[in-house]
Amino acid sequence: MRKFFGRLFAVIGGLVFFAVLGSMASLFILGKKEQALPEKAVLTLEVSGNIPETRGHVPFPLNLVQQSLSLYDLTCTLDHAASDPSVKGLVVKLGPNSLGLAQVQDLRQAVTRFRAKGKFALIHTDTFGEMTGGTLPYYLASAFDEIALQNMGNVAFVGLSMELPFARRLLDEWQVVPRFAQREEFKGIMETFTLEHMSESSRTELTALLKDIMAQIIQDVAKERELNEDEVTHISQSTPLYHAEEARRRGLLDQVTYYDLFETYARKKAGPGGALFPFAAYASHARRKGKEKSKDRPIALVFASGQIVRSATISPVSLMPTEAISSDDLTDIFDELLDPKKPKPAAVVLRVDSPGGAPIPSETIWRLLTRTKEMKIPVVVSMGNMAASGGYWIATAADKIVAQGTTITGSIGVAGGKIVLDQLWRRFGVEWGHVATSPNANALSPNEDFTPEQWQSFNESIDYTYTYFLHRVSKGRNLSAEKTHEVAKGRVWTGKQALELGLVDQLGDLHSAIALAGDLAGLDKSTTPAVTIYPKNQGLGGIFSGAFGPLLDHDGAQALLKSFVAQAVSATAYPAYRPH
């Protein structure tokens, strides 16, 4: 116990130390004189690593000296730079990054808007994949005026693929029983446990999905590179990779050079007096300029990313909530937005990027949006990389839904159940004893199978949830019951397909959704609407409320204590093991 509390206070002390150190560093940075913007600036940006949707609620000091720009920061800054006469162009150094398909389309569209204002946009990378993995980064690069590749780099524009494991034979060998139900044939999330091979319905669904996404990529690449679509298709199917010179010969590249030389080329392209200027420094400049907002009420932009849960769990390492869409957290945000004592937002844009989650918090969030609409506040949902299952459940409450062409959309279905381990335990000589006040108190335990009555009741619950989900879609999207069932069955669609099926209203990025919300609210179209972002960025005080706030209530204290106990036990009794 003494070791446990030693570790506990060591973590707390470390958090306080780094928070204060980070705050001092940030104050030092803020106190430095701002770099003067050159008259002919070329913005330099590295796109690599983790690029979050928004800076969110993670306090700045926890990142010490620097905090990476979010995707929203990038696109807003590019839009600002497009209208700035001092900015002549952009040069990007592209590295491995976390951008998904829809986010790549967001960034491509921002680059296109930048170029449409007469600016040049250049991009360089050391390689577009190695044998594989180059399609998505090349898709991003194709939106730029010029693409440069380092010597010895490759262009692995090889298309898209999915690989899924099917572990039924392994589970059978270990006498583990996967007891799952799904509604309907395309809701195959649990098939990895229940089947030995991919089902034909899953193969049909995923093949159609990848083909539609790849068709969008080929169409966009062909347009920007001034190539024939058949030629781009042939390139994607003919060889695993092209070396730099061969890729240039085929029209995929403009230059084969090193990044330092490419920067010099970009500076000269801006004309006499052209100078490189860091994108992050310009972003700070743009944020200050951007405070000159319209006189209209602001639009509330709420970011919601991750699995949908009732309450976000707390990491025992960082002492901060893990990334999730928490109905509790969103309830707090919307209670603030709808507070009758405060000015109401002109509209609400909810940015959803989620693979789904539990139906109960999904329904809670659905109600938050309908409450907002009842107060005559327009609601627009912008869907990111995906809005599947519970993510789409939430979206059905919106006045309008905006998605990218590649957004994974739908999965209108239900799956659930449990892994049954009783035979595995017996195999290793372990017996579980239990006591209960009723026959069904232990129904969801993995240590015993469902009884026939419990399995029937569980399936009835799955049917009820599925029917309820269908009703939400039918009413929210104004579709007949027959049409709703046709597009449901657990199937996922691209945003482009979803538009044709009536599941979304418009294709576009987050900025398109904000503009649409402004139109619904009747805001002045001649000015850029003011936007207030939620969750709000916290300062130093937010660290302690975020980290220690859960200690103020019993459930939070229990969760945090369990996390510390798991960490302390694993470090002392089993040094080689870390719980996941």
Q: Where are each of the predicted segments found?
A:
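Hydrophobic alpha-helical transmembrane signal-anchor segments
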Residues: 2-35, 39-40
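Non-catalytic accessory/assembly modules
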Residues: 13-20, 34-37, 62, 78, ...
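Cleft-lining beta-strand/loop regions that shape enzyme active-site pockets
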Residues: 34, 41-164, 291-424
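Charged, glycine-interspersed solvent-exposed loop segments at helix/strand-loop junctions
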Residues: 164, 168-267, 422, 426-524
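C-terminal long alpha-helix characteristic of the crotonase
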Residues: 223-224, 254-298, 415, 471-476, ...
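Intrinsic disorder and flexible/low-complexity segments
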Residues: 296-345, 461, 534-580
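Active-site proximal loops enriched in glycine and acidic residues that flank catalytic Cys/His/Asp
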Residues: 303-306, 352-354, 383-385, 398, ...
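C-terminal recognition in membrane/secretory proteostasis and scaffolding
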Residues: 351-352, 427, 519, 524, ...
